[in-house]
Amino acid sequence: MSLLRVTRSSGHLSAVCRLPARSISTTSILLVPSNEGNKPPTPMIDLEDKSLPIPIYKEKKNEPLQLQKSRLLYQSRKRGMLENGLLLSTFAAKHLESMDVKQTKLYDQLINMPTNDWDIFYWATGVKPTPAEYDNEIMALLKDHVKNANREKRICQPNLY
């Protein structure tokens, strides 16, 4: 049972939400390097919420390749988090059309099988090691894309047409 308490002081509203201890469990703590001079690394805490099961992704059977690529383009753009939206939409704009059937299937699995979008981001940026089932030619292409050797501006998603 959670508790929500709202209070008003000097014209401002504040809310306190107390969650049960079982709803949040810490699985690991990583240190993320700081980009600001001599500051020490900041801790990054991974949280797993076991109370909300995410349905297992079911691959679409007999989906035409062009329809699959259209779906993947949409899914690359609509991630629900800005970081992956920018990385995956620019990656898809650059590589998706030239992918063959096998590569398209690998990309489909990469963006739809993991239950946490932050995992995809951390694998692509090298913060966490990539699990064996996703460590393939598409992940290598994505990691190369993330390095941005040509220093392309990626502040918004590319136009569709």
Swiss-Prot record:
GO terms for biological process: mitochondrial electron transport, succinate to ubiquinone; mitochondrial respiratory chain complex II assembly; protein-FAD linkage; tricarboxylic acid cycle. It comes from the Eukaryota. It is found in: Mitochondrion matrix. Keywords: Chaperone, Mitochondrion, Transit peptide. Its main location: mitochondrion. One of its GO terms (cellular component) is mitochondrion. Residues 1-31 form a transit peptide. InterPro entries: SDH (IPR005631), SDH_sf (IPR036714), SDHAF2 (IPR028882). The keyword Transcription does not apply. Transmembrane segments: none annotated. Plays an essential role in the assembly of succinate dehydrogenase (SDH), an enzyme complex (also referred to as respiratory complex II) that is a component of both the tricarboxylic acid (TCA) cycle and the mitochondrial electron transport chain, and which couples the oxidation of succinate to fumarate with the reduction of ubiquinone (coenzyme Q) to ubiquinol. Required for flavinylation (covalent attachment of FAD) of the flavoprotein subunit of the SDH catalytic dimer. Belongs to the SDHAF2 family. Interacts with the flavoprotein subunit within the SDH catalytic dimer. HAMAP family: SDHAF2 (MF_03057). This is Succinate dehydrogenase assembly factor 2, mitochondrial. It comes from Aedes aegypti (Yellowfever mosquito).
